[in-house]
Amino acid sequence: MNILVIGDSCDDVFVYGVIERMSPEAPVPVLQPTNKTSNGGMSKNVYNNLKALDVQTTLITNKEKIIKTRYVDEGYNQMVLRVDTNDKCRQIDEALRMNICNNQYQNKTYDAIVISDYCKGFLTKSYIESICKSNTNVFLDTKK
């Protein structure tokens, strides 16, 4: 099986730590970091999950690096803050979109296409519609 994944992606960063006091400067908790993890998020998460199942997978995603950093109190396992960096991305190239619509991206034919749209600007409604109309096995997950 050969699957094409298209969509917005990000790096999901989790900073875990301990909160023992409030800041004297403002009514906010002070987090002492103890651990940090990073994973692919959004369409990268779909791609990584398919790869883990030994599925041949290709990812088309944004070049701009979107980072979602979550700060978590490990004592209560509660997120206390999320910081988003570079939250938007450029649209997919028209020539690339036409190759996808013709199901011939990189001279490959795909058994299925997964569209993972998180509304960050990489895919437009018209791009999604044309990909869906031009291919039979399309799975769409959109936040719209």
Kindly label every feature range from the protein language model.
Residues 1-26, 33-144:
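Ribokinase/PfkB-type carbohydrate-kinase core domain
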